[in-house]
Amino acid sequence: MGRELQKKKNRSGNAKIKLKPKSKRVNPLGNAIIAANWRQEETLTQNYRRLGLTSRLNTVTGGIEKKKAGPESKTSTANKLAISNTIPKSLAPTEARVERDPETGKIIRVIHDEKKTNPLNDPLDSEAEDGEGEGFEGFGDEEGSASKNEIVKMLEEQASRAGEKRERQQSEREKEWIERLVKRWGENYGAMVRDRRLNPMQQTESDIKRRVQKWKDAGGSVTTEA
């Protein structure tokens, strides 16, 4: 019988409703600095490019928005380290010295320029790595300026500030539970552990001792009935 009902449901014309998971929705306005400089008329990629940020670290695989003709953004740091997968269509000619055998005239070897070739335009295989005493000084812009975007500076300063760590406070129910334990067993923490009625969650001796000490430091004491 159950199988027939299942077949009937599968043949039904009523479409199954699937809810979109809210956990996958990204809130780009969670940061106050980004929210203050956000433009609603622009897309997420356009806003990130203008703010000097990037939404992904991998190289672009397709579906890139075509930019208008003109100078590129000087504050964007997106895809600066992405390695291009395309091979240049035209290679510039280079000069080299040829050594020949003085007797036969055959080419013995070809000596190229000391400049290291980089046909794939790999930024990790550039001349800057061969120089001595040179370090990474940031992305900069096309004009060679090392000045960073002000928004990026504000975000870096915000990230460098360590957040204040708040100590966990004991709830009223936890205080009442500790008070009942201390009222019954005093300082006998071993008996507190073995008490199945007052310790149903089987807290360890060290855990109960730490909670009791914290409760006493906060001014907790056993109340006596008159």
Swiss-Prot record:
Q: Where is this region: Disordered?
A: 1-23, 62-177, 196-226
Record's keyword terms, sorted: Nucleus, Ribonucleoprotein, Ribosome biogenesis, rRNA processing
Gene Ontology biological-process entries: ribosomal large subunit biogenesis; rRNA processing
UniProt biased composition (Acidic residues): 124-144
Polar residues: bias regions: 73-88
Q: Please note every region of biased composition (Basic residues).
A: 8-23
Specify whether Protein transport is a keyword of the entry: no
Question: Where is this protein localized, as stated in its record?
Answer: Nucleus, Nucleolus
Q: Does the keyword Cytoplasm apply?
A: no
Q: Please provide one cellular component term from the Gene Ontology annotations of this protein.
A: nucleolus
- Which Pfam families does the entry mention? Nop16 (PF09420)
Where is the chain membrane-spanning?
none
Enumerate composition-biased segments (Basic and acidic residues).
96-117, 150-177, 206-217
The family line of this record is: Belongs to the NOP16 family.
- What subunit structure does UniProt give? Component of the pre-66S ribosomal particle.
Give the protein's function: Involved in the biogenesis of the 60S ribosomal subunit.
The protein, known as: Nucleolar protein 16
Species of origin reads: Sclerotinia sclerotiorum (strain ATCC 18683 / 1980 / Ss-1)
Name of the encoding gene: nop16
